[in-house]
Amino acid sequence: MNYNHNQIEKKWQDYWDENKTFKTNDNLGQKKFYALDMFPYPSGAGLHVGHPEGYTATDIISRYKRMQGYNVLHPMGWDAFGLPAEQYALDTGNDPREFTKKNIQTFKRQIKELGFSYDWDREVNTTDPEYYKWTQWIFIQLYNKGLAYVDEVAVNWCPALGTVLSNEEVIDGVSERGGHPVYRKPMKQWVLKITEYADQLLADLDDLDWPESLKDMQRNWIGRSEGAKVSFDVDNSEGKVEVFTTRPDTIYGASFLVLSPEHALVDSITTDEYKDQVKAYQTEASKKSDLERTDLAKDKSGVFTGAYAINPLSGEKVQIWIADYVLSTYGTGAIMAVPAHDDRDYEFAKKFDLPIIEVIEGGNVEEAAYTGEGKHINSGELDGLENEAAITKAIQLLEKKGAGEKKVNYKLRDWLFSRQRYWGEPIPVIHWEDGTMTTVPEEELPLLLPETDEIKPSGTGESPLANIDSFVNVVDEKTGMKGRRETNTMPQWAGSCWYYLRYIDPKNENMLADPEKLKHWLPVDLYIGGVEHAVLHLLYARFWHKVLYDLGIVPTKEPFQKLFNQGMILGEGNEKMSKSKGNVINPDDIVQSHGADTLRLYEMFMGPLDAAIAWSEKGLDGSRRFLDRVWRLMVNEDGTLSSKIVTTNNKSLDKVYNQTVKKVTEDFETLGFNTAISQLMVFINECYKVDEVYKPYIEGFVKMLAPIAPHIGEELWSKLGHEESITYQPWPTYDEALLVDDEVEIVVQVNGKLRAKIKIAKDTSKEEMQEIALSNDNVKASIEGKDIMKVIAVPQKLVNIVAK
């Protein structure tokens, strides 16, 4: 008889709900474990089979840690602000609140049906005013610390949509949605000074138990480089062009400068002869996103401004060009081009027939740029020096002339924080008519997002909130001064920057969270989620956490001690699952046909947790067959416990049981769930080979199965005669002495040829080994009629007989 998953799973989900089995109490002295999932955006599509992979992994660990006596925090919530809900509202005229609420209900039902052990009393929702009150409060702390400021930033402005788009929303100069033209336009935006924390964000990565590849992604994103700031005087002008270079030693080879089309000097230095060309080029560049402009594969373009600069060390005149591959937002928005020793500059110089001056020997600059090491040539006082020495000397020479200095540069830019959207947290700032601005008093938080039917863009570059006079216009009660509320909203990243803190104390109305509770639970011990959040979410959350640490609000420097990225589940043909391909698998269907336990087991058994693996119906069926085998081993047709399970131990399963406990325990610690499941299968196969199974061993097995397949785990535990839930039962232990065999297999050779393999007791003496070998029938046949010259016995290994 196979088990009825629909009945059993519903029964135990109801039991857990009614008994609040997974409710977490803040037992502040107890050893703790905080297991966190990246909370989902509740889209209209509901859960897909990719979601449960990470969720199952953290759930297994949470259940395992509870059984080890840990106080476990394992919460779930909703990252519910963001563009898709607003887009839906625009397209249908429905309120994004209703849409979001409905989606959350669907997600929650699906998640509960998968048997995850979340404490639902700690659920958070980023769109709940009681939650975003504290998101706004954190913004005010950032503002007071000088880390939030207004700046004029070049943004992707789409007049047809009446809004600013992110770089990801612009493709080939048009909007991803609707294909409308997009232009680069300077607009006032809120920016967060993440660059102030660049060095800390970089240095503290070393202490984290994160995948090295992910740490490298953050290191590259921060992009710290050491070099020099160099100043070039513009010929016949007061202007100076400042560049940052990591290779000041190559300055004698700088044969032209390239400015970004938006550089502040371009208009003033361009000569009349080149004005029209420069203007036309600037217009074209404004239609491209930064990603397109810096694409290495694209053909280089640029125009000469007619102006020249003076090389501060050689005194030579060099041309000043503009080109879109130089961005105004990186470094100084200008570069010194050394075509002999840089591939991109070489390509540009060849295309526009600009001078190529070799300053490091070792290559052939007629054919290609030389980017290797070597002695300096054609470089004045730097001649004969190798790279490092030349860099130091070049900086000294520049400093002496007042034309440069040593400098550290970062690729990381400050974080553009405002969005011209409705469905986000209002930024708690008021702009007064006298030109000042203040934050909303903390006691007035939350500043509520007003309800409105008019979500369409304002058309002015402000958010739809600008259309709501009752929200926008304010008067200071004390002075009578008029003001306008900030109409931009926060990005979706804001709510997800700190949600792991709110889970610790979700109902606290007086503070973000109780300091004692924060001290108990932080840092997060295990954080599992997709690698697509490697940079933005994880970097932003680390930044906010460090600010809160400096303010004395959180007790740790870092939020997430161990981080793990689960792999992607692909469609059957190894393709990414997508609606358009029609290969998306809905977990609801699997729960119905195979059961939640089967889905959980299968997703953990597919392969290593971090690998990308194709979905397979056969694999799913195989996982179900294993659970049926477990059920049949333990449960009779009539639902009673099998008589095969006995209270006496005939020792036949001693070794495999103890091996299983050891292997599963070790594999759970390293998230090696696929190999842990293989070992559980080995144990069940051995149980089928014997007549009797020792009850404590099968109980230990059920405890190990329960974190992976909790519904069948609970049901079998109750069949074994237990009334209480398996959730807090102690994790099984193993006996080292029983892991080893008392028997070994030895080989017997005659004149170097293998003649027999024999099992003997481990402590057999050399003399006994010789006797056993010589009495073996195969060996007897091999030495018949021969004289035995010598017998060599190596304990536990072999017996070698030399016969003539």
From Swiss-Prot:
UniProt cross-references to PROSITE patterns, sorted A to Z: AA_TRNA_LIGASE_I (PS00178)
Alphabetic keyword roster: Aminoacyl-tRNA synthetase, ATP-binding, Cytoplasm, Ligase, Nucleotide-binding, Protein biosynthesis
Any GO BP: leucyl-tRNA aminoacylation
Protein name: Leucine--tRNA ligase
Placement of sequence motif 'HIGH' region: 40-51
Cysteine disulfide links: none
GO molecular function, a single term: ATP binding
Native source species: Staphylococcus aureus (strain MRSA252)
Motif 'KMSKS' region boundaries: 576-580
